Every structure is written in structure tokens, then in C-alpha cells.
């Protein structure tokens, strides 16, 4: 019953559905029946769309696929290896090392990131940073977003360059985790944003 209610909410009120399915792929093929009555109710009452709610009631909510907030979103792919940046199923609220894992053939929350207009590689509330306490290993960690420069990156020539250290994001095949390394001409440092608004 809860599944059907969520589906009705999504179809009746939400204007974007892709992000919904990313977090609840189990509902993608749920049969919900005719919802025309609900859509007519919304139109008849002049109900505002979900975007209005985000802009007027909850403006501090980060929307990971909205071009108002992001330059790109989706999988961040290393084309040479076919691997993607991955949370390795870690929880958003936890601090953890970012993984480097074969890209899924389907949308997956563990490989969904956005590159914000503020220069953050981020999930909903966590941002990629270089663990300065681990400069020997140069691991890249997800930590709560704080707006500080330690979480800022530039995306130039398909490279993510950390603003403070000038190190590049690197994925090594056979390595479980991402790292940062001195920038060089190497396919291990090239990345594609799956949905890049700047390329559109």
C-alpha cells in the first residue's frame, strides 16, 4: 500500500520523476491504475507544482539535477576504464572514502553525484574533499558540505582539479578507492559527467 501511495504522490505532484526512481527503483514498474481524477483535482484547485514548493517553502533544499544549482549530474565516468565514482553503499550521513567501481548499466544511487555551481562534487548533503591527514595516500573522502575551499573543485578539460591543492582526481584500475594525484596527461584522470549542462 505504501508503494502505491508513493507512486500516486510522484505522478500527481512531482514534475521530475527520474530522481525519484533512482532512490526507489523497486517502484519503477508498479501498477497504480488511473490517476486522472487526482490530476484533475490538482488542476481544478490550482495547486502549485513541486518546484514551487522547493523555491518558496524549502529554498535551502539542494536539488541535485536542477541546472539552477548544478553544472552536471549523474554518473561521473572514467571512460578508459568504464569505472565510476561510487559511494560503495555508504550512507550519506557518514564520512567515507569514495570508491572507484565498474559503472552500473542502470541508474544507481551509489553512483549518482552532481557537480554544483559552487564547484562541489557532491551527494545530497556530502561533498568530496581530500583528506589532508592522509596526504600520503591522497584519498578522496565524502564529508558534510560546509562551503569551505577544501571541498571545491574545478572541472577543466575533463579533469577535476582540487582548488586548494591543485591535485587531480584519479581512478586507478584495480584500486578500490579514488585518490588525488599531481595532474598529468593520463586517462586515469579524465572524467565525463553523464548529464553535463555545459555541454548541452
Model-found features: residue ranges?
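Lectin-like carbohydrate-binding module/patch detector with strong preference for beta-trefoil
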Residues: 62-200
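Catalytic cores of eukaryotic secretory-pathway lumenal/extracellular enzymes that build
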Residues: 1-58
Amino acid at each position: 500500500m505504501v508503494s502505491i501511495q508513493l507512486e500516486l504522490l510522484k505522478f500527481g505532484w512531482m514534475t521530475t520523476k527520474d530522481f525519484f526512481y533512482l532512490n526507489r527503483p523497486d517502484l519503477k514498474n508498479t501498477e497504480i491504475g488511473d490517476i486522472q481524477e487526482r490530476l484533475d483535482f490538482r488542476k481544478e484547485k490550482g495547486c502549485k507544482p513541486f518546484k514551487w514548493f522547493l523555491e518558496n517553502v524549502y529554498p535551502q533544499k539542494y536539488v541535485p539535477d536542477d541546472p539552477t544549482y548544478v553544472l552536471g549530474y549523474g554518473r561521473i565516468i572514467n571512460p578508459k576504464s568504464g569505472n565510476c565514482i561510487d559511494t560503495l553503499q555508504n550512507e550519506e550521513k557518514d564520512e567515507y572514502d569514495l570508491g572507484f567501481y565498474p559503472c552500473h548499466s542502470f541508474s544507481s544511487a551509489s553512483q549518482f553525484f552532481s557537480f554544483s555551481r559552487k564547484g562541489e562534487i557532491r551527494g545530497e548533503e556530502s561533498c568530496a574533499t581530500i583528506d589532508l591527514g592522509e596526504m600520503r595516500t591522497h584519498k578522496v573522502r565524502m564529508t558534510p558540505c560546509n562551503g569551505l575551499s577544501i571541498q571545491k573543485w574545478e572541472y577543466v578539460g575533463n579533469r577535476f582539479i582540487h582548488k586548494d591543492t591543485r591535485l587531480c582526481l584519479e581512478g586507478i584500475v584495480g584500486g578500490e578507492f579514488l585518490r588525488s594525484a599531481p595532474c598529468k596527461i593520463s586517462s586515469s584522470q579524465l572524467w565525463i559527467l553523464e548529464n553535463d549542462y555545459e555541454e548541452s
